[in-house]
């Protein structure tokens, strides 16, 4: 709803200026009315309760009370006493809690069997109760709500638009409509409850009543949490003892409202304690500025002033009350008309003075005679006195006088004492107003207020005398004289001066002593002297008098209890007098002292532990305990041993740290509604940061192991990269440990709150007791009984010993051991951990070493001999030492969880418990292996005794091992099949190895290492790819060279033996058959082995080839991806760089082109001269056509061209200006020019490069502008230089008197110049708002000029344009004259140091726009000649303007002819061509030279000459004296209207557009005139007339006439800006705020803050 409200307000503000504003306010009022009635608050809940319990009559009464409360709230806006009485925060704060407590107490005891009776008539006793409850709760609704922003916002809106009658009426209808809708909804709810409820309706009423009482109690508790009443707090007793002479503090009843209950200076309720500094200076501010708002007269109207004195406001109100001055009705005559008349008269006088000065300028008066001068004090010889003794200057510009330290020199008496003596004498004279006020005061018997001229009472006189003595008896001088003296403005010394001389302090002491002597006479001291005291002294004096009267009241009360004859009337009179004391002295300043807390609070620099008497809360601790250093075997604490303190701070947000105990708490802000119970408060601003995931940071050890060369890897690379996270090596456990630590801390922080500790602590303790005393004993008993049943020896002793070693240590939440028998303190709030030392693990049997140790312990040593005893002892000690060393090597411990599991650390990973049946299964496997080994051994024995076993020794048991086990080792280092022999033959066959050459004859289960080497071609790929299949292992079968020879020889020998045995086979037929059968079986086994070998090779080869192929693909893909990313990045960087470079070049080029095209077309077109008969060639010359084309026209044609499916040459020629071309077929000729310069070779105009444009520009000599034209391209810079010139002239004094000594002036000349600069800056700052036409049109002059002046300037411009074209009839040789202009001697390096006639044309090749090497070299060659030559330069000037115009035409024609004849030397044109030509023509003039020219010869200044520098330094001071006698020749076509055109003594009429009219006035008069013209003293009816009349008395012109005259070149915005005066701008008064309104906050816009809301006009 609030969002809808803001949108509606924005719509109203936007639609405010339109005529339909009343309709929008009506809609907004209706919306506001519904919002004020419909939200469910406490009053609405009470209305629902009244309808449900009291019927329709009770509900109607509740609604009436709610409407009445809303009406009172709205009336409080119009009538402030209602707001003070009912709605003021101080009063309503005290009323809320008692009323809610009373209401809750009244509704809580209603029984279920006594439901409330409905209200049937208005005579019922419940009528008044329901109405008052609804009325009061509607008033308290904005306070009781948990978040009253909505209700207060509505009140703010109605306060904003309370002056709109349409809004008030519509909001009233909105309230009524909202309440009617609310009543109908309640009735519908009642019907639904009666119809749908299955419970008895009276019982429902009782339940509703009980629920409502609960709601009231909850809201009351919420209110207590929000704003507790600061009545009963913990006092902080200060250690200082009160002095006997100290004034007794006023009692509680003497304090005014609301300070009596809500005192912001309540020293015993600080929020945070800030300790004083080492020097006793507290960082807390001692006082702050406090604004006092009051009405005052400003600009002829009543306005709000925030710098008014409370004393003056109080005196004005009391004087109006006692003199019965009635309020002046709005219909009567305005009391400020006299002030308006005076200010209007001053404004008219100032305007008339300025008008007269302007008219004098129009009448050909010199500006030096018209300009206003400052009056200065001088003697009869016109010697101006120094500024220190000039009374016409303010004291800020006089400087400060350095008082001599010599005791023989005495200063004169300050002028302030003389002024005060005069003021005292004037006050003694008769004053008619004073007598009249005194008579009226005596007639009305108003003795409560003392008049200023009345003498002091005896008590007041004694107090004043006491203060004077205290000031005069000070031993040490104070640096702040305003604290010493009683008067506000005694001396000129400011507050920031740190030292003061003894003589000045002696003067002050003499003055205070004189004041003390004058106070001895009772008649000379009155209340006016008290008012002249400083603010602090006045306040101290008033409090002193107040305490004196309070002492009198206390003495009277003592007599009252002692004397029973005192009347009640006297008592009431004294009480009234006591409470009226503070109304008599209300003289205060606008500075409010800040509360200062006591510095005796017990506070320490660090968070001290174990101290309970501190006055400041320290950081919240948790798990605080004492850890003892000496612990026995059972970890029992010995109280006599030393201990150390272990402290750990809470991880939760600690909002009460550094708070003074007993101080008021602040609410937790920036908390979301759904996170009100969260552990750590986070503002919504930081929620988005919490949602961002933190990237995983791989440790350095792990990152070094991961192969960064191939990121996209197959299974082999993934195995190398990820297996280290889960491997068992020491280096590879680092990452897993760090990752687990992070997760463990996260879980611990999530469970670190009180409710979780309650739910976790109890199950943890129960699990500890169950494990120690239930589970483990049951397992021990079951195990030993099972051993007995299995006819094994029970192990009762071993098991119970291990059970007794298991110790459960109670620890803090972070795992710090505390105690074995006791739980930590506050374990249910701060958490608990249980650490198990030597945890018990149930085993089926114990270790053999333990058994040997126990067996040896049970042996009797006496039964052995000496040798046996030594051997037995050594055996016993060795076994025991080995066991104890293994036991002490590492203490086994774990932490218990609530599920009974064990972890290695709190909230860590679950430890893997040893499996009980694992030793049993292992033992069974060993037995099975042993049985199989015996069977194999028996088979071997049987085979040895076989009859044919001795003849056929091919596979003897000594050579061929028995096949006992074939397994595949799947470890990470072995990927081949490995043969594992029997335990018995393991040592014999460890060195048995084979070769790949006789692999066909090998039995099953043996695979050589060479079988892994697939081929020479793939071996390198395998090693590069994974490196797994080529790794050597200790378990691989590797053949030996000697063994290979022996086995081969033995094999062939056995084969030969078998062939020899064929002869004998006939004798033994059965043996031959068996041998053949064995050979067949062997061959069959060989084929199987060969097949398995091939299949294994194929599988390995396939896998390796796949891995190698995928590795190559991934490596190539990764490389290409990196190349692609790198290429894109480089491409993007180059693209952005080129964009910026091209944009800068284009912008720079277009800016220069636009300036040349729009502002300086006059100078560009001067050289465009077309000859008719003479010098005209029938053939078109390309360079001649180029010179006839302007650069601006070229760029303009390119911009206007359309490049889509068309040739830009046609569009270029379409928009071309035909005026610049000669003859016919200009398109063809222009095409030839463009083709020669390489412009047509480009496909599109936007593809033209910089070189193309440079080639084009090199053909245009008009693009090389001289320096006097470039100075006008940047007029703002030129104007700034002129402004600097004026600053330099104003900074130096007008006259320097050497006869008067200046030893007492401590201000240096540099400081005085800085002050004058600041003054000039302020004047320009205020006037800059009038310089509004900085970018005005060139073709038209300022609109506020007269018609006659406009005509003169238009004619002049027309003449200039006519000079651009030359007719053939005017080319008469008799009219050939030359013009010589030597301008801009500020740049002597651009001129040639020789005797020539200087001309503008000579300067053109020296400052070309395109910097060429030839010009640079030419300049370097002439540099030495220019520095050494100091000859005179002759300059001539024509006496006739017409002669100059004709000579200029002919000179341009001659110059054009020279250019055509010397095309190759066009760029670097020699300077002597035109000089020689002019000398030739000059020689033809003969005797007419003297009549035509004026000699203006001068010498070039030396660059390095001390005399010249000295002259320039001294002449600067002379410029200020003759500042109006030098002419600053500026261009007519400057951008700004205000210009400085200072006329020479020749006397010539100047226009007001060439200079600043306000320069003829002094800065002080300028500002006065501007401020007097700003206020609208006569209203808005004469505003149009003022605008038509103009500012400086110029001829009036209406808006219509101005628009008609300037229709083509100016728009309406320019017209409005040029007539806009500072009275319609806020910036001008804002800039003058600090100087005219005396604000002290340093902000220029302080006055603008008074208007808090924008106004909406009907």
From Swiss-Prot:
<dbReference type="GO" id="GO:0009706">
    <property type="term" value="C:chloroplast inner membrane"/>
</dbReference>
<keyword id="KW-1001">Plastid inner membrane</keyword>
<feature type="transmembrane region" description="Helical">
    <location>
        <begin position="52"/>
        <end position="72"/>
    </location>
</feature>
<feature type="transmembrane region" description="Helical">
    <location>
        <begin position="82"/>
        <end position="102"/>
    </location>
</feature>
<keyword id="KW-0934">Plastid</keyword>
<dbReference type="Pfam" id="PF05758">
    <property type="entry name" value="Ycf1"/>
</dbReference>
<dbReference type="InterPro" id="IPR008896">
    <property type="entry name" value="TIC214"/>
</dbReference>
<feature type="transmembrane region" description="Helical">
    <location>
        <begin position="199"/>
        <end position="219"/>
    </location>
</feature>
<keyword id="KW-0150">Chloroplast</keyword>
<comment type="function">
    <text>Involved in protein precursor import into chloroplasts. May be part of an intermediate translocation complex acting as a protein-conducting channel at the inner envelope.</text>
</comment>
<comment type="subunit">
    <text>Part of the Tic complex.</text>
</comment>
<keyword id="KW-0813">Transport</keyword>
<comment type="similarity">
    <text>Belongs to the TIC214 family.</text>
</comment>
<keyword id="KW-0472">Membrane</keyword>
<keyword id="KW-0812">Transmembrane</keyword>
<feature type="transmembrane region" description="Helical">
    <location>
        <begin position="165"/>
        <end position="185"/>
    </location>
</feature>
<feature type="transmembrane region" description="Helical">
    <location>
        <begin position="130"/>
        <end position="150"/>
    </location>
</feature>
<protein>
    <recommendedName>
        <fullName>Protein TIC 214</fullName>
    </recommendedName>
</protein>
<feature type="transmembrane region" description="Helical">
    <location>
        <begin position="28"/>
        <end position="48"/>
    </location>
</feature>
<dbReference type="GO" id="GO:0015031">
    <property type="term" value="P:protein transport"/>
</dbReference>
<keyword id="KW-0653">Protein transport</keyword>
<keyword id="KW-1133">Transmembrane helix</keyword>
């Amino acid at each position: 709803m609030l969002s809808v409200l803001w949108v509606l307000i924005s719509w109203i503000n936007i639609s405010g200026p339109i005529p339909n504003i009343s309709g929008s306010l009506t809609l907004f009022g209706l919306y506001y009315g519904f919002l004020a009635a419909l939200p469910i608050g406490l009053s609405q809940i009470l209305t629902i309760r009244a309808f449900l319990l009291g019927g329709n009559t009770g509900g109607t009464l509740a609604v009436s009370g709610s409407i009445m409360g809303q009406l009172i709230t709205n009336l409080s806006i119009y009538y402030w006493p209602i707001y003070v009485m009912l709605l003021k925060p101080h009063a309503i704060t005290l009323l809320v809690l008692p009323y809610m407590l009373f209401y809750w107490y009244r509704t809580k005891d209603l029984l279920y069997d006594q439901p409330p009776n409905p209200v049937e008539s208005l005579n019922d006793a419940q009528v008044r109760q329901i109405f008052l409850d609804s009325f009061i709760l509607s008033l308290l609704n904005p306070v009781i709500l948990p978040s009253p922003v909505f209700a207060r916002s509505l009140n703010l809106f109605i306060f904003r638009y309370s002056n709109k009658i349409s809004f008030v009426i519509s909001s009233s209808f909105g309230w009524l409509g909202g309440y009617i809708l609310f009543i109908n909804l309640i009735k519908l709810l009642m019907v639904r409850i009666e119809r749908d409820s299955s419970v008895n309706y009276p019982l429902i009423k009782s339940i509703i009543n009980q629920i409502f009482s609960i709601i009231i109690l909850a809201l009351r508790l919420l209110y207590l949490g929000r704003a507790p009443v600061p009545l009963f707090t913990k006092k902080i007793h200060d250690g200082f003892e009160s002095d006997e002479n100290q004034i007794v503090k006023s009692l509680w009843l003497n304090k005014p409202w609301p300070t009596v209950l809500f005192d912001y200076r309540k020293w015993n309720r600080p929020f945070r304690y800030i300790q004083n500094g080492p020097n006793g200076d507290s960082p807390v501010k001692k006082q702050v500025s406090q604004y006092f708002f009051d009405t005052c007269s400003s600009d002829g109207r009543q306005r709000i002033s925030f710098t008014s004195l409370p004393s003056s406001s109080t005196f004005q109100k009391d004087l109006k009350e006692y003199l019965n001055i009635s309020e002046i009705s709005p219909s009567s005559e305005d009391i400020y008309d006299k002030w308006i008349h005076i200010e209007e008269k001053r404004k008219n006088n100032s305007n008339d003075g300025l008008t007269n000065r302007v008219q004098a300028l129009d009448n050909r008066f010199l500006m030096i005679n018209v300009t206003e001068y400052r009056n200065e004090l001088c003697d009869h010889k016109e010697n101006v006195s120094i500024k220190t003794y000039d009374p016409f200057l303010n004291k800020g510009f006089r400087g400060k006088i350095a008082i001599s330290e010599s005791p023989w020199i005495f200063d004169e008496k300050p002028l302030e004492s003389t002024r005060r003596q005069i003021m005292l004498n004037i006050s003694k004279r008769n004053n008619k107003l004073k007598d009249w006020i005194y008579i009226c005061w005596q007639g009305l018997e108003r003795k409560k207020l003392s008049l200023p001229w009345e003498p002091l009472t005896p008590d007041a006189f004694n107090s004043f005398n006491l203060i004077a003595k205290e000031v005069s008896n000070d031993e040490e001088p104070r640096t702040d004289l305003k604290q010493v003296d009683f008067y506000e403005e005694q001396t000129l010394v400011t507050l920031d001066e740190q030292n003061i001389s003894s003589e000045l302090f002696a003067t002050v002491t003499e003055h205070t002593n004189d004041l003390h002597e004058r106070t001895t006479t009772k008649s000379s001291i009155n209340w006016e002297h008290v008012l002249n005291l400083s603010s602090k002294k006045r306040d101290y004096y008033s409090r002193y008098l107040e305490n004196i009267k309070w002492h009198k009241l206390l003495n009277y009360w003592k007599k009252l209890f002692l004397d029973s004859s005192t009347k009640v009337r006297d008592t009431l009179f004294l009480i009234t007098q006591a409470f009226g004391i503070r109304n008599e002295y209300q003289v205060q300043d606008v500075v409010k002292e800040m509360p200062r807390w006591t510095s005796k609070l017990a506070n320490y620099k660090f968070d001290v532990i174990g101290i309970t008497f501190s006055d400041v809360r320290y950081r919240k601790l948790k798990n605080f305990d004492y850890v003892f250093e000496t612990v026995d075997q059972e970890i029992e604490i010995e109280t006599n041993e030393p201990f150390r303190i272990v402290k750990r701070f809470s991880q939760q947000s600690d909002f009460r740290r550094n708070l003074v105990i007993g101080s008021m708490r602040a609410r937790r802000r920036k908390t979301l509604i759904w996170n009100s119970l969260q552990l750590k408060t986070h503002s919504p601003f930081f929620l988005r940061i919490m949602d961002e995931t933190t990237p995983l940071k791989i440790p350095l050890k792990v990152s070094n192991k991961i192969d960064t060369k191939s990121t996209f890897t197959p299974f082999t690379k993934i195995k190398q990269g990820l297996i280290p996270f889960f491997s068992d090596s020491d280096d590879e456990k680092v990452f897993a440990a760090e990752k687990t630590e992070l997760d463990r801390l996260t879980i611990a922080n999530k469970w670190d709150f009180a409710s979780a500790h309650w739910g976790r602590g109890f199950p943890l303790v129960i699990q500890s007791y169950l494990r120690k005393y239930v589970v483990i004993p049951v397992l021990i008993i079951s195990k030993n009984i099972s051993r007995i049943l299995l006819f094994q020896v029970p192990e009762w002793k071993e098991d119970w010993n291990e059970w007794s070693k298991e110790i459960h240590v109670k620890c803090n939440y972070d795992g710090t051991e505390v105690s074995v028998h006791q739980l930590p303190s506050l374990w249910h709030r701060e958490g608990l951990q249980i650490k198990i030392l030597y945890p018990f693990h149930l085993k089926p049997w114990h270790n053999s070493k333990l058994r040997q140790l126990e067996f040896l312990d049970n042996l009797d040593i006496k039964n052995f001999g000496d040798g046996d005893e030594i051997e037995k002892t050594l055996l016993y000690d060795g076994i025991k030492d080995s066991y104890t060393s293994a036991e002490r090597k590492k203490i086994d411990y774990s932490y218990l969880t609530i599920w009974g599991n064990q972890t290695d650390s709190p909230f860590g990973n679950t430890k893997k418990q040893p499996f009980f049946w694992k030793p049993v299964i292992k033992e069974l496997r060993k037995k099975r292996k042993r049985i199989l080994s015996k069977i194999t051994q028996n088979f071997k024995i049987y085979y040895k005794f076989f009859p044919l076993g001795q003849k056929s020794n091919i596979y003897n048991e000594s050579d061929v091992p028995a096949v006992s086990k074939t397994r595949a080792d799947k470890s990470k280092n072995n990927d081949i099949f490995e043969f594992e022999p029997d335990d018995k033959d393991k040592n014999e066959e460890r060195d048995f190895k084979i070769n790949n050459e006789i692999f066909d004859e090998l039995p099953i289960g043996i695979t050589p290492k060479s079988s892994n080497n697939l081929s020479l071609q793939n071996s390198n790929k395998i090693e590069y790819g994974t490196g797994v299949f080529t790794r050597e292992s200790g378990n691989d079968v590797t053949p030996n060279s000697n063994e290979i020879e022996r086995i081969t020889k033995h094999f062939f020998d056995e084969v030969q033996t078998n062939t020899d045995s064929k002869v004998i086979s006939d004798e033994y037929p059965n043996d031959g058959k068996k041998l053949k059968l064995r050979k067949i079986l062997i061959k069959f086994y060989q084929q199987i082995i060969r097949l398995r070998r091939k299949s294994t090779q194929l599988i390995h080869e396939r896998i390796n080839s796949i891995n190698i192929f995928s590795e190559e693909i991934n490596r190539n893909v990764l490389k290409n991806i990196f190349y692609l990313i790198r290429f894109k990045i480089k491409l993007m960087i180059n693209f952005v760089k080129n964009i910026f470079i091209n944009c800068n070049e284009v912008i720079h080029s277009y800016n220069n082109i636009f300036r040349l095209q729009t502002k300086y077309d006059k100078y560009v077109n001067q050289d465009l001269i077309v000859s008719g008969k003479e010098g005209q060639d029938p053939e078109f010359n390309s360079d001649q056509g180029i010179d006839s084309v302007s650069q601006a026209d070229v760029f303009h044609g390119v911009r206007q061209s359309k490049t889509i499916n068309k040739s830009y040459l046609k569009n270029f020629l379409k928009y071309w200006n035909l005026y610049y071309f000669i003859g016919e077929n200009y398109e063809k000729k222009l095409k030839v020019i463009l083709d020669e310069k390489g412009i047509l070779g480009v496909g599109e105009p936007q593809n033209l490069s910089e070189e193309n444009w440079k080639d084009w520009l090199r053909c245009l000599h008009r693009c090389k502008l001289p320096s006097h034209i470039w100075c006008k391209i940047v007029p703002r810079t030129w104007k700034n230089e002129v402004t600097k010139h004026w600053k330099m002239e104003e900074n130096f004094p007008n006259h320097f008197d050497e006869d008067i000594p200046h030893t007492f002036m401590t201000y240096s000349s540099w400081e005085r110049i800085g002050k004058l600069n600041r003054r000039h800056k302020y004047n320009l700052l205020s006037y800059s708002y009038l310089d509004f036409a900085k970018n005005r049109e060139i073709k038209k002059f300022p609109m506020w000029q007269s018609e006659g002046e406009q005509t003169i300037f238009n004619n002049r411009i027309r003449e200039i344009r006519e000079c651009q074209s030359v007719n053939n009839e005017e080319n008469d040789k008799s009219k050939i004259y030359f013009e010589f202009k030597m301008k801009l001697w500020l740049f002597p390096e651009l001129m040639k140091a020789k005797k020539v006639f200087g001309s503008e044309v000579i300067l053109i090749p020296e400052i070309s726009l395109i910097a060429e090497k030839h010009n640079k070299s030419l300049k370097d060659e002439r540099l030495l000649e220019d520095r050494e030559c100091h000859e005179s330069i002759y300059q001539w000037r024509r006496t006739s303007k017409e002669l100059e115009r004709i000579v200029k035409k002919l000179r341009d024609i001659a110059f054009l002819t020279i250019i055509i004849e010397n095309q190759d030397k066009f760029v670097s044109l020699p300077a002597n061509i035109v000089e020689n030509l002019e000398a030739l023509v000059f020689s033809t003039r003969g005797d007419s030279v003297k009549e035509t020219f004026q000699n203006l010869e001068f010498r070039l200044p030396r660059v390095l000459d001390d005399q010249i520098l000295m002259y320039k330094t001294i002449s600067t001071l002379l410029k200020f004296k003759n500042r109006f006698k030098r002419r600053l020749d500026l261009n007519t076509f400057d951008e700004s209207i205000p210009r400085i055109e200072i006329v020479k003594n020749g006397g010539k009429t100047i226009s007001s557009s060439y200079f600043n009219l306000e320069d003829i006035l002094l800065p002080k008069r300028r500002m006065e005139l501007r401020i007097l013209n700003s206020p609208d003293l006569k209203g808005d009816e004469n505003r149009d007339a003022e605008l038509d009349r103009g500012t400086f008395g110029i001829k009036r012109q209406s808006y219509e006439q101005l628009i008609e005259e300037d229709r083509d070149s100016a728009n309406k915005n320019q017209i409005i800006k040029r007539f806009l005066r500072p009275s319609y701008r806020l910036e001008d008064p804002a800039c003058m705020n600090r100087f005219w309104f005396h604000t002290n906050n340093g902000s220029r816009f302080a006055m603008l803050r008074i208007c808090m809301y924008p106004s909406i006009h009907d």
